[in-house]
């Protein structure tokens, strides 16, 4: 009797797939559109740390679906590549003294080795790397299309500059902390600094980026995050005349009904009217205030927690409806980049205005209340309500009615117009770093921009020794004079020395997979039409705003230019949950590294002081030493065990803690299948009961894969395998279909079993997914509830009349039950036949 030698089996089939290019795909014109599918993982950044067990979760999910679709006769595109430009490689290069290109390519080799060891069905002939010159040539080409369309421009703006990283960061790459703004990557201090930057006019696409979310099957949470980031506001733009002047100040508001409660105007420090209206005696102090405030971040200035500051300009405006004179202030909490850079302040009905008015003793006039009567205002009333203290024609009306009447009055009197505003800012697209795509633009002596011609691409990143940041805000490329200075038509021009951000290459990589070796165009249109859109895109929720928003923007530009055939690139999006790990906390809440923890009698103690620790679930991190390396898992249990365990841990979209005990259970499951394989193989007709169970299993596994409920599909397979073990013989009519439906989850074992049954070629080329027959199914299953302390944790299907001992065993092997009773004392177990198992624990 042979043993399950997973190391030998997995190496054998990985070599076979490589040699025979089993997963190579082409654009077969005979395959109808409904039988084509494009399944995509968010490609990884190849860090020096390699993969951890969290990476393969999404990859395994797409791989299972890919193999399932192959077995159902689909033409499947399932590629992989590497997002290999960007700051991390450059920072690591600076730390180690090794060139970022060498580091990156070494890391990619390691990643590929790890990915291949997990047996994923990628078409490696389509591999892309964003730092490859044959790839970034087309990133540069797309940038030039944006430039020619008027969507790329330069401007000197206050930007986030990180001295430690030596580069400018986009707003999205900066986080606010109690100690001030920090870089998201590396947690370095950042400051505001005026620099000439490239920007992309993503704001031109704001409305479409919101509207077209209706066309995609994405999680509602991701759609909301994108909508909130874009920040659409519908309101009215109102003109306020300045007293004793012909000048006007325009303000944007979403609450025109509150115009009767305006007691002052506030301008952003950078508003162009500030210098015009400020009284001479106040100009020195206001100039100093302006210089200080405009270097602060948007978040610093607008945060509700921050103290609001301001200065009176000495000027007054006239309320267009009430004709009241109101003072004009400048205030830190108003941004020049949002709306008009001016706000009509209604402190009775806005939190920030209320704080500002209280601080500077400005009038507070209530014009809306919940009941339609005056109320004592402890805090501003910001809801809709009934108008009060307003002219007769507007008084005692609901908010929506007042809004309508005010807008109508303003439009008729040419003092306002309806308007839509967005919080979204143009995308800062340049970085003062080396390891990125060179921007294909020249400048003459007058700083006029000259785009490179298509035949001058790629503009190759020069191979240099000193790629450290200059410290002045200039790129390291600025020091390479023979690269920077370009002679053309007898004149000397200078190259743009900034590089593109790390997001550039990932904005369009899903298109290059369709035609990765094309030297004449970024992708052949027929191939784009054949495969697009991406049918399923799986990746982390951390990319909900940046990558997905930027990729959608570039795609829409390419759509407008006629290069792609659909409006949205990713039809369906799934965010896999995070795989966490156990961590240990002392009495002060401090996390203790795992190698300083020991277990005694199901409790955890510090090795240093023997004090008891609390076990919690936390994100894997190097400092806590709780990162699980997939190489170790594969070596000990095999790739198939790891793949199945990651899918069995819980629903794909849930976060769940890694528990090696659960992995051991999966390893036993695969060994059970091997035990069945070792039994006498027979062509005899199986008993009706087994045939019924087989068709139930095929039905459930089929439905679960289609809906990406892999954990319940695996559970169903486990139940059926346990059933088969009870029989002395191995029925070919059962073992053949069960091997096929197992193979997407455990492809190496699936191939080995297929060969064992006498087949010559790959199961994924030669087998067909089995059909279930409803007429063969005998309904002898029951749904039971699994509870902990009377609270339902899961519902599962079991065989009717399952005995109490088996019920308990099923409950204690259930992942959700394991998570809820971990480290608890079991008081008693209550079972009700065919209905429930309730574990009482404390």
UniProtKB/Swiss-Prot annotation:
This is Leucine--tRNA ligase. Its main location: cytoplasm. Its EC number is 6.1.1.4. The gene is leuS. The lineage of its organism: Bacteria, Pseudomonadati, Spirochaetota, Spirochaetia, Spirochaetales. InterPro entries: aa-tRNA-synth_I_CS (IPR001412), aa-tRNA-synth_Ia (IPR002300), Leu-tRNA-ligase (IPR002302), Leu_tRNA-synth_edit (IPR025709), M/V/L/I-tRNA-synth_anticd-bd (IPR013155), Methionyl/Leucyl_tRNA_Synth (IPR015413), Rossmann-like_a/b/a_fold (IPR014729), tRNAsynth_Ia_anticodon-bd (IPR009080). One of its GO terms (molecular function) is aminoacyl-tRNA deacylase activity. ATP binds at residue 622. A motif ('KMSKS' region) lies at residues 619-623. GO terms for cellular component: cytosol. One of its GO terms (biological process) is leucyl-tRNA aminoacylation. It is found in: Cytoplasm. A motif ('HIGH' region) lies at residues 44-55. The keyword Cell division does not apply. NCBIfam families: leuS_bact. Keywords: Aminoacyl-tRNA synthetase, ATP-binding, Cytoplasm, Ligase, Nucleotide-binding, Protein biosynthesis. Belongs to the class-I aminoacyl-tRNA synthetase family. CDD domains: Anticodon_Ia_Leu_BEm, LeuRS_core. It catalyses: tRNA(Leu) + L-leucine + ATP = L-leucyl-tRNA(Leu) + AMP + diphosphate.
């Amino acid at each position: 009797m042979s043993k399950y030698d997973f190391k030998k089996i997995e190496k054998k089939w990985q070599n076979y797939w490589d040699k025979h290019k089993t997963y190579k795909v082409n654009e077969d014109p005979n395959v109808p559109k409904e039988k084509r599918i494009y399944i995509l993982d968010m490609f990884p950044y190849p860090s020096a740390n390699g993969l951890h067990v969290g990476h393969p979760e999404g990859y395994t999910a797409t791989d299972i679906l890919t193999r399932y679709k192959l077995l159902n006769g689909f033409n499947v595109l399932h590629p992989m590549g590497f997002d290999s430009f960007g700051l991390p490689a450059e920072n690591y290069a600076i730390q180690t003294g090794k060139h970022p290109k060498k580091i990156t390519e070494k890391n990619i080799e390691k990643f590929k080795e790890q990915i291949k060891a997990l047996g994923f069905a990628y078409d490696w002939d389509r591999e892309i790397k964003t730092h490859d010159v044959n790839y970034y040539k087309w990133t540069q080409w797309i940038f030039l299309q944006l430039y020619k369309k008027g969507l790329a421009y330069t401007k000197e703006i206050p930007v986030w500059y990180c001295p430690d990283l030596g580069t400018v960061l986009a707003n999205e790459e900066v986080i606010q902390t109690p100690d001030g703004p920090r870089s998201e990557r590396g947690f370095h201090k950042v400051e505001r600094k005026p620099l000439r930057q490239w920007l992309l006019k993503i704001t031109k696409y704001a409305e479409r980026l919101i509207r077209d979310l209706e066309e995609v099957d994405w999680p509602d949470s991701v759609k909301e995050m994108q909508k909130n980031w874009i920040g659409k506001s519908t309101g009215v733009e109102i003109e306020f005349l300045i007293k004793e002047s012909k000048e006007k100040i325009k303000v944007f508001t979403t609450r025109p009904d509150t115009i009767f409660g305006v007691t002052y105007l506030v301008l952003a420090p950078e508003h162009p009217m500030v210098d015009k209206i400020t009284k001479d005696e106040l100009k020195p102090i206001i100039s100093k205030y302006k210089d200080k405030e405009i270097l602060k971040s948007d978040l610093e200035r607008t945060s509700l927690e921050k103290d609001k500051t301001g200065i009176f300009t000495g000027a007054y405006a006239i309320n267009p409806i009430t004709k009241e004179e109101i003072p004009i202030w400048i205030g830190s909490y108003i941004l020049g980049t949002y709306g008009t850079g001016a706000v009509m302040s209604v402190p009775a009905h806005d939190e920030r205005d209320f704080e500002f008015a209280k601080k500077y003793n400005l009038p507070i006039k209530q014009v809306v209340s919940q009941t339609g009567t005056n109320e004592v205002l402890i805090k501003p009333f910001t809801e809709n309500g009934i108008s009060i203290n307003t002219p007769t024609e507007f008084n005692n009306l609901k908010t929506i009615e007042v809004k309508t009447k005010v807008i109508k009055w303003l439009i008729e009197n040419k003092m306002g117009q309806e308007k839509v505003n967005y919080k979204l800012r143009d995308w800062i697209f340049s970085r003062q770093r080396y390891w990125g795509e060179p921007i294909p633009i020249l400048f003459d002596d007058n700083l006029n921009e000259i785009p490179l011609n298509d035949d001058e691409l790629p503009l190759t990143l020069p191979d240099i020794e000193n790629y450290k940041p200059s410290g002045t805000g200039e790129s390291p490329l600025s020091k390479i004079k023979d690269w920077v200075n370009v002679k053309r038509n007898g004149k000397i021009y200078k190259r743009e020395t900034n590089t593109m951000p790390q997001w550039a290459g990932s904005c369009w990589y899903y298109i290059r997979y369709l035609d990765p070796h094309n030297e004449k165009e970024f992708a052949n249109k027929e191939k784009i039409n054949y495969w697009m859109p991406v049918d399923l895109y799986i990746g982390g929720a951390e990319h909900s705003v940046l990558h997905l928003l930027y990729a959608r923007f570039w795609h829409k530009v390419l759509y407008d230019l006629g290069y792609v055939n659909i409006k949205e690139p990713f039809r369906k999006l799934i965010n896999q949950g995070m795989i966490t790990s156990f961590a240990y906390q002392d009495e002060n809440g401090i996390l203790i590294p795992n190698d300083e923890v020991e277990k005694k009698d199901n409790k955890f103690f510090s090795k240093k002081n023997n004090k008891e620790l609390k076990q919690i679930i936390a994100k894997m991190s190097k400092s806590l030493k709780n990162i699980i390396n997939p190489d170790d898992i594969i070596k000990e249990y095999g790739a198939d065990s790891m793949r199945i365990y990651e899918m069995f841990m819980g629903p794909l979209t849930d976060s769940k803690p890694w528990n090696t005990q659960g992995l051991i259970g999966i390893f036993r499951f695969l060994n059970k299948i091997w035990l069945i394989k070792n039994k006498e193989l027979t062509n005899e007709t199986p008993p009706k009961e087994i045939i019924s169970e087989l068709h139930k299993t095929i039905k459930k596994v089929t439905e679960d894969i289609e809906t990406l409920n892999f954990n319940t599909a695996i559970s169903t397979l486990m139940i059926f395998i346990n059933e088969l073990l009870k029989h002395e013989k191995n029925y070919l009519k059962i073992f053949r279909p069960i091997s096929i439906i197992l193979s997407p989850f455990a492809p190496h074992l699936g191939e080995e079993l297929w060969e064992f049954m006498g087949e010559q070629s790959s199961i994924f080329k030669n087998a067909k997914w089995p059909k279930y027959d409803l007429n063969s199914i005998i309904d002898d299953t029951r749904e039971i509830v699994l509870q902990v302390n009377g609270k339902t944790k899961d519902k599962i299907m079991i065989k009717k009349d399952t005995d109490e001992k088996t019920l308990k065993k099923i409950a204690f092997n259930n992942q959700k039950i394991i998570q809820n009773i971990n480290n608890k004392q079991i008081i008693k177990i209550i079972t009700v036949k065919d209905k429930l198992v309730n574990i009482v624990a404390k």
